[in-house]
Amino acid sequence: MGIKKYNPTTNGRRNMTTNDFAEITTDRPEKSLLAPLSKKAGRNNQGKITVRHQGGGHKRQYRIIDFKRNKDGIPGRVATIEYDPNRSANIALINYVDGEKRYILAPKSLEVGMEVMSGPEADIKIGNALPLINIPVGTVVHNIELKPGRGGQLVRSAGTSAQVLGKEGKYVLVRLTSGEVRLVLSACRASIGQVGNEQHELIKIGKAGRSRWLGKRPTVRGSVMNPVDHPHGGGEGRSPIGRKSPMSPWGKPTLGFKTRKKNKASDKFIVRRRKK
């Protein structure tokens, strides 16, 4: 996937970049794998904002993705590589020999016509999914499960990858994209390869309107609000925040304040903390 640059014909286009979508092979998704996706706009069932800066954006349909990769021993062939508006990675449509169709995350170098398979007997090949115990040390993986059978939860964004570092009893050591080294049950599955569309992080939005197309609403600084709206608000002109450390809108310390729960149950699985 390449990056497309534009001539500065307008201020919005001056620094804007987009994907060239060279890897995409079709613009029509598989209808049987679509589901309706209603707008939440960051509200809960009471209509109260629980996530700020969300709302608007283009209408989308959800693509049902196979994160579990539990169709063991049945080979499938890549039919298309498609764009998914709900995630940064591209997706691949797999046609299995028994007639079933499924979407999977498209790893880097996966092409139309290639064969993929799941299960303990699958080869160590791009796009295949195996239990971690069957994956050799040093292999690059993505879409890693945290509990066997639950489906992949880690390393699913565009361009991300993890590496199998070693095996200790019923656990496997995995180094994640953040640098964190973590123990994962060896029965958990992972897919071989790096997630595709690795150029995604280089895209420049270019203008505010394009963020709105993506469903992102503006972020307003607390210092320009009123005291009733934010701890940093109020004062005459450009005033300091008046606190010994920056605060969130709800009065909690922020910017460097550790928010991870102390003595969290999963702490025992973290061998080395992520890089700062």
UniProtKB/Swiss-Prot annotation:
Keywords: Ribonucleoprotein, Ribosomal protein, RNA-binding, rRNA-binding. Residues 7-20 have a biased composition (Polar residues). Residues 1-20, 219-276 are annotated as: Disordered. SMART domains: Ribosomal_L2, Ribosomal_L2_C. One of its GO terms (cellular component) is large ribosomal subunit. GO terms for biological process: cytoplasmic translation. It comes from the Bacteria. Pfam families: Ribosomal_L2, Ribosomal_L2_C. GO terms for molecular function: RNA binding; rRNA binding; structural constituent of ribosome; transferase activity. One of the primary rRNA binding proteins. Required for association of the 30S and 50S subunits to form the 70S ribosome, for tRNA binding and peptide bond formation. It has been suggested to have peptidyltransferase activity; this is somewhat controversial. Makes several contacts with the 16S rRNA in the 70S ribosome. Belongs to the universal ribosomal protein uL2 family. PANTHER family: LARGE RIBOSOMAL SUBUNIT PROTEIN UL2M (PTHR13691:SF5), RIBOSOMAL PROTEIN L2 (PTHR13691). Part of the 50S ribosomal subunit. Forms a bridge to the 30S subunit in the 70S ribosome. This is Large ribosomal subunit protein uL2. It comes from Bacillus cereus (strain ATCC 14579 / DSM 31 / CCUG 7414 / JCM 2152 / NBRC 15305 / NCIMB 9373 / NCTC 2599 / NRRL B-3711).
